[in-house]
Curated annotation (Swiss-Prot):
Superkingdom of the organism of origin: Eukaryota
Cofactor: Mg(2+)
Protein name: Tubulin alpha-1B chain
EC identifiers of the protein: 3.6.5.-
GO biological process terms held by the UniProt record: microtubule-based process
The protein's role, per its UniProt record: Tubulin is the major constituent of microtubules, a cylinder consisting of laterally associated linear protofilaments composed of alpha- and beta-tubulin heterodimers. Microtubules grow by the addition of GTP-tubulin dimers to the microtubule end, where a stabilizing cap forms. Below the cap, tubulin dimers are in GDP-bound state, owing to GTPase activity of alpha-tubulin.
S-S pairs: none
């Protein structure tokens, strides 16, 4: 088996996690109490969904997941909510005091006390796996727990499980919408850790997803639940081929192989189609070609950045539902002829496609329509550097005056870490610039050597 352990950190991680597990349960026909009427092999069994769920001898399906937060309120909602019987109580770990939007609290003071307990629970889950494939980690980089504790845990996972892939879903601060004044500090410090300790990071930002919900689903005031259900569809599409059988399956390691040209350049942009409400879907059904065009639209991106300003290095297209390889080939051929979609000159093909016959499920009473086919695109583009330069700029404005820095130093952090992290991000922006630059002719390159 190729099992995967999901780790949900902080409020953002936990709430995205709730939406994901709600959707996985629906897709596999697992009830909120963990029973699965359709599953004939009770206790164990080698079904495809066992990558995400372990089975007990009584036929209960338990998510291979851990929730961690430094304060209890968000996870208490799971302990009392609809899915309270789904998770093992030991999988929900909470501290008593929160990280107060402070990276240093999450990483040094408060986080230190709880990290060994968390790693112990991770080890227990890992011991139940016959062939652990990797980790999916969910967190935000703007808060204190997600940024500080998130990077602490990733560092420790690198030590204990060096060879396993770590895929990271991180919610980045939006350009306009901010939830904390010190977001830029936390994000820069956290990204510094993500650069080293994750294999692939998927960037999400609330503002981009708000706009998607508003525009495509006609929700006037989207709530986090609306956003998270959309994110859950993306994450579900990424993991479908791990949980169901399909025509072109995509393994977790294949993401890395196909999307990451250089180890540091591993920040991905995600987009998803069709995002349509039930009323609209009644009148239209999107073809493979239309879906393929839609995911390349800047308005479909899950992070605020315009791919037309950069070049693509690689794209992963995951189709699901009623899709045949012939249609996919035709759709990709059309995309390749478009002038607006530019690839770097050293990566001429750049497409990896996956097809899965499992049609997308939707949460009953949710906003998304039930459709026959859907497409999720993960792309590695130089445009994502926009996200970093935005955060860096805000960081510089505050750090020039050393505003709020005493809160971090007071929690045992050294001021040097700020400049170290900031320099690392400056180098990252430069890396993206170089990757997108035109390759010089061989003769010139040799002269420069």
């Amino acid at each position: 088996m190729r099992e995967i352990i999901s780790i949900h950190i902080g409020q953002a991680g936990a709430q995205v996690g709730n939406a994901c597990w709600e959707l996985y349960c629906l897709e596999h026909g697992i009830n909120p109490d963990g029973q699965m009427p359709s599953d004939k092999s009770v206790g164990g069994g080698d079904d495809a969904f066992n990558t995400f769920f372990s089975e007990t001898s009584s036929g209960k399906h338990v998510p291979r997941a851990i929730y961690l937060d430094l304060e209890p309120t968000v996870i208490d909602e799971i302990r009392t909510g609809t899915y309270r019987q789904l998770f093992h109580p030991e999988q929900l770990i909470t501290g008593k005091e929160d990280a107060a939007n402070n990276y240093a609290r999450g990483h040094y003071t408060v986080g230190k006390e709880i990290v060994d307990l968390c790693l112990d629970r991770v080890r227990k889950l890992a011991d139940q796996c016959s062939g652990l494939q990797g980790f999916l980690v969910f967190h935000s980089v703007g808060g204190g727990t997600g940024s500080g504790f998130g990077s602490l845990l990733l560092e420790r996972l690198s030590v204990d499980y060096g060879k396993k892939s770590k895929l990271d879903f991180c919610v980045y601060p939006s350009p306009q919408v901010s939830t904390a004044v010190v977001e830029p500090y936390n994000s820069v410090l956290s990204t510094h850790g993500l650069l080293e300790h994750t294999d692939v990071a998927f960037m999400l930002d609330n503002e981009a997803i708000y706009d998607l919900c508003k525009k495509s689903l006609d929700i006037d005031r989207p709530s986090y639940a609306n956003l998270n259900r959309l994110v859950a569809q993306v994450i579900s599409s990424l993991t479908t081929s791990l949980r169901f059988d399909g025509a072109l399956n995509v393994d977790i390691n294949e993401f890395q192989t196909n999307l990451v040209p250089y180890p540091r350049i591993h920040f991905m942009l995600a987009s998803y189609a069709p995002v349509i409400s039930a009323e609209k879907a009644f009148h239209e059904q999107l073809s493979v070609a239309e879906l393929t065009n839609t995911v390349f639209e800047p308005s479909s991106m899950m992070a605020k950045c315009d791919p037309r300003h950069g070049k693509y290095m690689a794209c992963c297209l995951m189709y699901r539902g009623d899709v045949v390889p012939k249609d996919v080939t035709a759709a990709v051929a059309v995309i390749k002829t478009k002038r607006t979609i530019q690839f770097v000159d050293w990566c001429p093909t750049g497409f990896k496609c996956g097809i899965n016959y499992q049609a997308p499920s939707v949460v009953p009473g949710g906003d998304l329509a039930k459709v026959q086919r859907a497409l999720c695109m993960i792309s590695n583009t130089t445009a994502i550097a926009e996200v970093f330069s935005r955060i860096d700029h805000k960081f510089d404005l505050m750090y020039a005056k050393r505003a709020f820095v005493h809160w971090y130093v007071g929690e045992g952090m050294e001021e040097g870490e700020f400049s170290e992290a900031r320099e690392d991000l400056a180098a990252l922006e430069k890396d993206y610039e170089e990757v997108g630059a035109e390759t010089v002719g061989d003769d010139e390159a040799e002269e420069e050597m």
